Amino acid sequence: MRKIFIYAMWGFVFICIAAVAIVFTAIAKGKIGYVPPVEELENPNLKFATQVISEDGKLLGTWSLSKENRVYVGYEDLSPHLVHALVATEDVRFEDHSGIDARAFMRAVIKRGIFMQKHAGGGSTITQQLAKQFYSPTADNVMERLLQKPIEWVIAVKLERYYTKEEILTMYLNKFDFLNNAVGIKTAAKTYFAKDPKNLKIEEAATLIGMCKNPSLYNPRRFNERSRGRRNTVLDQMRKAGFLTQEECDSLQALPLVLKFQPVDHKDGLATYFREYLRGVMTARKPDRSDYRGWQMQKYYEDSLAWETNPLYGWCAKNKKKDGTNYNIYTCLLYTSP
């Protein structure tokens, strides 16, 4: 009887492993769910706002089609405190895995599935969370979410193949929605602390990273004490990971959570009339005589001359990307001089 039980148990394990292998193979081959092609993984759509920068390097403002106003920031312009806080809190073995952390996953399965511990922590890596942000719409029910999980695993493994760890961290922080129209870490740092990401203090970085668990629940503007508690949890995780000493952690946890909240709007900034004029010039199309009334012929000749002689006039229509499509003024980086 005991042998039969052992055989049955191992048979069940084998069937489960085979089923998982079949599911993952079907997902990887595109038979189940949507797995983006290589081209899409290599060029994810982050919808960054265009930055208008003066000749002396000052930011005049941005152009954006939405209220998100997401502005790109490179890895070199991120505070190391942000990176340390994110890795320590969300994925402590980030540097060691290839998209899936088997140890974290099994821990989550055992604690949540067997011991029913609601606060046992998740098993998703930073790369899996990035895959979810890019390609998983909000699930309507538990079964739909369960199907999304293995698809995210496959996408996460592919992302790890095409991007470095630094690039994955950068995309994650540029993609995340920190609420209050603060999408992306650069806008979030400006909105909550009135500074660039590279200048964030340890406790400020911990506050923003604390929002990654649940931005609505840990919104520092609405729930200061709750957000402070979450910040302190992040600081403690940084201590456990070796990024902070016990003394540093204790002193930072004692600090109040102080914001310099100032919503960022793409319509704000310097030289607003000039920026609007420049936008009109760069998005102009090649003049067509049929679009001009009889009394507008002088305007037609002026626009035609500008099209032929001014490289900025109609810049978006004149220039194309590597894929053959025209540039979009709302998704490119522009340097100009007022």
Per-region residue spans from a language model:
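Terminal amphipathic helices with adjacent charged low-complexity linkers/tails
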Residues: 249-260
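SIR2/sirtuin-family catalytic core signature
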Residues: 303-312, 320
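Peptidoglycan glycan-strand catalytic modules in the bacterial/periplasmic cell-wall system
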Residues: 46-49, 53-245, 251, 267, ...
